[in-house]
């Protein structure tokens, strides 16, 4: 079991008790069936302690690397949301402007009209746009399609071939298509690739060296990393580390480490990336998200708010992509925690009782985040 400083000097670490508590919870997650757990807690001064337990490679039995790189799935959405909010600050984008203003003629279909969907509704998942990920690619055997390159425009066409889920603004429904469209908005406004905008506006600004948006066709994880695993059609955990994450694109393609995710989320709220009014805008007016994200959750503009067991609200996001799950948030006192596991809860769940078993497995990850932020 490795325990040490993540992304900082050995002496730079939150309280020993906090790190030990995170370590024991991480060990509990391995016992629950996750191949490996990589976690980091970062205090409000930016000092981190890391944990790495389990097996980073099931074939060799090798230990997972401390603060290794993992696919961060939907945490990508918060990076995209920050870029959009920066563009709002710069007067290049209007939150309550219709997406039609920026992507004329693109967003249309059955019950779908880009002139009636605002940028804010896309950020908040209240647009009513149909979902693309329920038909591509992981609805069948992911191992058959994991190396397929599907251009983002094709993913959008898949979504727009379906009817709208609801009238814009009428409901909330977590939908990856919203962030596909926001990625296209960023590219249209900047005339540059969305990954490059994230790199220039966020990654370089914060000095992150293990956080990146994969280049087209990039299937491997560049830096030191644990292997990610998924359940094969034969019911075995198989290595799925190498895959083309393009189908996640601006909704879920990025790679980072636990400590760098903590740094990013702290920077979202401490003024390094956004003005206070932008930060308030992202949190205020957050809508009830308990139908999908569980009791006590709300969704702002690219942010998930969660009621803590000790009172107050944590803000972060979290991400799911084949092989990796990350749960992360920043607490009211500025402490940040990320817990990354190297298989989805559904992959280690009881397959005969899949839904409730996967929910129970994932709840343990969320509980580890809550306990750390509550200094338990």
Give the residues covered by each predicted segment.
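Short active-site loop at a secondary-structure junction
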Residues: 33-35, 60-122, 166-175, 249, ...
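Residue-level preference for non-acidic, small/hydrophobic
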Residues: 26, 45, 77-80, 84, ...
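Solvent-exposed serine/threonine-rich low-complexity stretches and specific carbohydrate-binding patches
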Residues: 54-56
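Hydrophobic (often cysteine-bearing) scaffold residues that line and stabilize catalytic clefts
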Residues: 18, 22, 72, 76, ...
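Short, surface-exposed loop or secondary-structure junction motifs
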Residues: 111-314, 318
